[in-house]
Regions:
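General small-molecule cofactor/ligand-binding pocket signal
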Residues: 39, 159, 255-257
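Beta-rich nucleic-acid/ligand-interaction surfaces
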Residues: 41-60, 161-171, 260-268
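TRNA-binding/sensing appendages of the translation machinery
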Residues: 1-82, 138
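Hydrophobic mid-domain F-helix/FG-region of cytochrome P450s
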Residues: 143-150, 164-174
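A residue-level structural signature of the nucleotidyltransferase/glycosyltransferase Rossmann-like core
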Residues: 73, 157-158, 304
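Positively charged, Gly/Ser-enriched RNA/tRNA-binding surfaces
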Residues: 16-34, 45-46, 81-154, 194-329
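Acidic, His- and aromatic-enriched active-site or binding-groove loops in soluble protein domains
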Residues: 61-68, 174-197
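Short, solvent-exposed helix-helix connector turns and helix-capping sites enriched
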Residues: 162, 190-191, 220
Length: 329
């Protein structure tokens, strides 16, 4: 008899579980070596508390909601950054920064599972609280690359962008306020066909529309930062400063990705994603969220990242198959 499980979820059997355990222990070892203490938060949070994060991005993953016996509205956490922001404000109100936390936890998102998106995700990551840019961002990228190296992943690259870049360009060419959210939503999905359509609908002059379509498609070394217009100056300077602080073995993993827009609405500056040729989707990502802690009563700059353990496992298996077939990086 077949007893189904909800779409977007899966069982993990012993052989795969052993492999995933090796991955998570490798990640934990690097996090611990860099001074990140592991925390765990409830899977259930009060909706009213997490609403302080003011996540209004149209591409924000939807959450599961339910009522408890007293009628209070609860949500299943969709990531760990917002719960850790709550922890910092409530449990570490006077602790001097920087504060370093890591985690291994399940998160839940009320997505349309028929699109292949998981409803339950196992994530590992860090949050660095109280360390401003560019130094804090460089530390997070360093820990990220060393953690991936520890798992044995070889072919990955880290795309580095800035959440303020595209909004600054839109403001610079005076995109109508009512059109900006639609453009950002298309860019977050990497849907350049939809981006081009939305730019046409916004009624921009051809040159300005071409600028907003071409800049997000720039990806590569420092040369892609050249020739950007004045409104992009702050974002470009920030990305350059972060890159200059990286050790050579980390810097060689980083590429500039000017179309990078993370779907979570709290990012304010540098953002990054992990790519690997063995997987057709990002393995993980993160960025700066310098305004989030202030919404919980403790204004501190912050940066962090999360890695999807399932996707990391698939990428490692794909690289192993590639080596077995005689493929090289």
């Amino acid at each position: 008899m077949i007893h189904p499980i909800p779409s977007g979820t899966r069982d993990v059997l012993p052989d795969e579980m052993r492999e995933m355990r090796l991955i998570t222990e490798a990640l934990r070892g690097v996090f611990d070596a860099h001074g990140y203490g592991e925390v765990y938060t409830p899977a259930l949070e009060y909706e009213a508390v997490l609403a302080r994060a003011e996540l209004t991005s149209p591409s924000q993953p939807p959450v599961y909601r339910m009522f408890d016996e007293s009628g209070a509205l609860l949500v299943l956490r969709s990531d760990m950054t917002v719960p850790i922001a709550r922890v910092v404000a409530t449990r570490y109100p006077q602790s001097p920064p920087p504060l370093r936390f890591c985690y291994l936890a399940h998160c839940y998102r009320a997505v349309r599972a028929q699109r292949g998106q998981p409803r339950e995700l196992l994530q590992a990551g860090i949050e660095l609280i109280g360390s401003p840019a560019p130094e804090g961002t460089a530390e997070a990228l360093t820990v990220l690359c060393r953690a991936l190296d520890a798992t044995g992943l070889e072919g990955y690259r880290v795309g580095l962008g800035d959440a303020s870049l595209f909004p600054a360009l839109m403001a610079g060419v005076e995109v109508p306020e009512g059109a900006r959210a639609e453009l950002l939503e298309a860019l977050a999905r990497r849907d350049f066909v939809e981006l081009e359509r939305a730019l046409g609908a916004a009624g921009l002059p051809a040159g300005e529309a071409e600028l907003l379509l071409s800049v997000p498609q720039r990806r590569g070394g420092p040369e892609v930062l050249a020739g950007l217009p004045g409104p992009a100056a702050d974002a470009v300077a920030g990305m350059r400063m972060v890159h200059e602080l990286l050790e050579p073995e980390v810097a060689e993993r980083v590429i500039f990705d000017l179309g990078l827009v993370r779907s979570l609405g709290y990012y304010t500056g540098a953002v990054f994603e992990v790519y690997d040729p063995a997987l057709g989707a990002p393995i993980g990502g993160g960025g700066r969220y310098d305004e989030l802690l202030g919404r919980f009563g403790r204004p501190l700059p912050a940066v962090g990242f999360a890695l999807g353990i399932d996707r990391l496992h698939i990428a490692l298996a794909g690289e192993e198959r590639g080596r077995g077939a005689g493929l090289t990086r």
